[in-house]
Amino acid sequence: MRKTLQKVMSFYLFLFLLPILLIKIPILAFGVDVPKQVDTQPVAYAANVTKEIPVVEESSPINVLLLFTHSHEAYHPIVKQVIGVNANYDPSTNITDTSDLITHHFQLNNAQVDLLQYDNMKEMKVTNRPFYQAYAAIRPVLQKQLNTKPYDLVLDIHRDSAKHKITTLESNNESFARIAFVVGAGHSNYKLNEAYAKALSAEVNKIVPNISRGVMTKTKDDGNGIYNQDLSSKSILIELGGIQNTQEEINRTLAVIAKAVSVVFENNTAT
């Protein structure tokens, strides 16, 4: 009797535990796979969390050598504010004062400017050299500097003697000092300089239409004919406005020149 009761109790216990066993044990029940429990909590893996960030490589700055062969050339509106009268040349207030502005605008356009620290017209006066010898006077100083490092551009800045009507441009309610590019054809490699001058002239005109008066290629019959441009294949002379241009007009134009230099020399668009 006792054994029969034990068998009955065991049978009922088995029936009670059977559903639990079917859940806990991964077996085939009624021909259907019992899926394993899947953890839906997110798991962070270092390899997956770190996103690939593209590296932006900055191009090397354009190396520019800046000089002023006619270092005492002046602008009437600017010099008059200082000395009270108009003057075409002044030993203190002159075109060399634009060097800080040029450096500033060029730095904003990934260009590093070295200024040739030489007051050419002052030294010419000391040695009693005539005006027409200005390029010969500065040549050894320029040559020495060019030997120190390679330059992508040698920029000789001048002020034209032309009047306001010729050297000024009105564009979008702002006035700009117009510029002219001068290339000396009195040496065998002038075509290289001319190509860069033409590229720069075209680029500034894209930024501000008609701001460039064009490229003037001159032989010795037209003037100096070389302008020390035989010392570098990327040497350019720029006439920055004229005697009647203002500080504001010059500043706006320098911003345009700096941008054009950046485009032409970084993309090497001179042809």
Q: Predicted segment positions?
A:
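Active-site-adjacent mobile loop/cap segments within catalytic or ligand-binding domains
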Residues: 215-271
